[in-house]
């Protein structure tokens, strides 16, 4: 990302560490958010003092032309403003996609309609009890991208991944776990088929050396 202009959409909890990481590496960052400067309060001043540009308000997605655009997890990648930016040459990505690219250790990821957080937490606790150094994150805990510099190859990253995070993923974890599938988030996904397709991305890019675990008691995952 060096020498590239970067836009980060959303200045929420999940993206603030990403913004600060990019700024710490002297990358040109524009943070975009629907909130007003008044709503952001002191956070707006803090980011600007670190060299971050702000693009705020109802038109926060207008005119995106940065080299790389990080979308917030719950945002569809095919919004007209984003597809227009991609057509102009921007690369659309997310914090989790970049994490998969740079994380030096093996990754275990959990998705599903129910039980994701419980399953992810149990896996992390079992590995810790076995003496492993575990990094817990994704849709649970806190963003892990800023911690990759301190991760070792022998560590394990345990991740909870939502359908929104998985929609555009081009990488899969070493171990993928799907708890179950049932109609969910259809206010964002076009239909149940798209929701299932997003979930399938957790194992789509696995190799013969990787492991996929499914719930045989769920009619959809059993197929």
Please annotate each region the language model reported.
Residues 61-66, 73-223:
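Phosphate-binding loop of NTP-binding sites
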């Amino acid at each position: 990302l060096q020498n590239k202009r970067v836009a980060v959409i959303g200045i929420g909890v999940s993206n603030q560490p990403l913004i600060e990481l990019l700024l710490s590496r002297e990358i040109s960052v524009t943070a975009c958010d629907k909130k007003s400067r008044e709503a952001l309060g002191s956070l707006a001043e803090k980011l600007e003092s670190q060299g971050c540009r702000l693009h705020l308000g109802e038109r926060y997605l207008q005119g995106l032309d940065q080299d790389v655009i990080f979308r917030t997890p719950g945002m569809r990648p095919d919004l007209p403003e984003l597809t227009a930016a991609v057509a102009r040459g921007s690369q659309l990505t997310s914090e989790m996609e970049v994490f998969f690219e740079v994380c030096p250790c093996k990754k275990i990821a959990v998705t599903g309609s129910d039980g994701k957080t419980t399953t992810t937490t149990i896996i992390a606790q079992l590995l810790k009890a076995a003496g492993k150094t575990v990094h817990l994150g994704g849709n649970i805990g806190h963003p892990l991208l800023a911690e990759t510099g301190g991760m070792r190859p022998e560590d394990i990253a345990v991740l909870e991944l939502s359908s929104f995070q998985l929609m555009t993923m081009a990488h899969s974890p070493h171990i993928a776990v799907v708890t179950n599938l049932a109609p969910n988030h259809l206010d964002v996904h076009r239909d149940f088929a798209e929701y299932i397709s997003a979930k399938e991305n957790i194992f789509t890019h696995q190799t013969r050396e990787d492991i996929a675990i499914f719930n045989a008691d769920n009619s959809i995952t059993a197929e």
